[in-house]
Amino acid sequence: NEAESERRRDLALRAVTAHIATVDRIESAARQALSGAVPADERDTIAWVERGDRDARYEVNAAPFEVGDFLRAALFARTPSVVLTSATLAEGRSFAFLRESLGVEAAQELIAPSPFDYRRQARLFIAPGNLNPKDRDFAQKAAPIVEECLDRTSGRAFVLFTSYARLREVRALLAGRLTFPTKLQGELPRAALLDWFRATPNAVLFGTGTFWEGIDVVGDQLSCVIIDRLPFPSPADPLVAARIAALEARGRSGFEHYMIPSAIVRLKQGFGRLIRSKSDRGLIALLDGRALSMRYGATIVDALPPATRIADLSALDALWAEFAPLRTSIPKD
């Protein structure tokens, strides 16, 4: 009846009004938190609010987008000597990006040769230049390449993505097609996933950022690393946006001086999952055709370890023949 309808409309209006009031309170609290998180004299600090993926909690973050002054005062000026060492500190043959990022003005530099024979141990396959991760049909075109790579290496692979959305899309396209044991990041805790991968013959792990670095799987158990795209930082990240803006305010290209060096370092980290000993061998497959079609692609690829480039995945047969054959037994589920 009309009275009942009026009552329901009134309840709905009250609910909407209460929700709007809640949003206003959250916005007001966030503004107050942000204003308190960054002192007025801290111009090099950026603050932002993040919301949890699975709940309604909000988190206020603040960080300096240039850490050089802080490190000079807190570390370099107080310590007689500081040694910075890693396999991926340099982008190519230069420490310029790292030095500028950390505010290092004077330092002795050393780029030591690798103990690995990458030309003999590793093959690098880059997808055709018309394969662009920005295209709508990228996943549809990339999935068959992923499938062929996995068939050629009998699984034993990390398939690394820069986003969960792309990971899920490609995995869905391969559902029912892969004969190898597979797991996706998030199905188990990270440590449990690694234990599963190391213990499972012919395993395939689909992962994102957390598996790009700090992972050590020696031997044929990891014989293939597939990377979906050139890992440029996201311009939507507040710190990335601030650093790009700071560079461009000084008349420098944010893409050239920040995005490209960042992608090089990140790609080298992903590459580094493959060859962990002098007896390792395997395939790095980059599915981003921009590495071939764009001018900056050569800069990025040339900074990688000198693996032998292949244009056809059938060239892997010679690599497997040179080393001990892969075990191809696939466990029954």
Role assignments for model-derived ranges:
Residues 1-333:
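ASCE RecA-like P-loop NTPase motor cores
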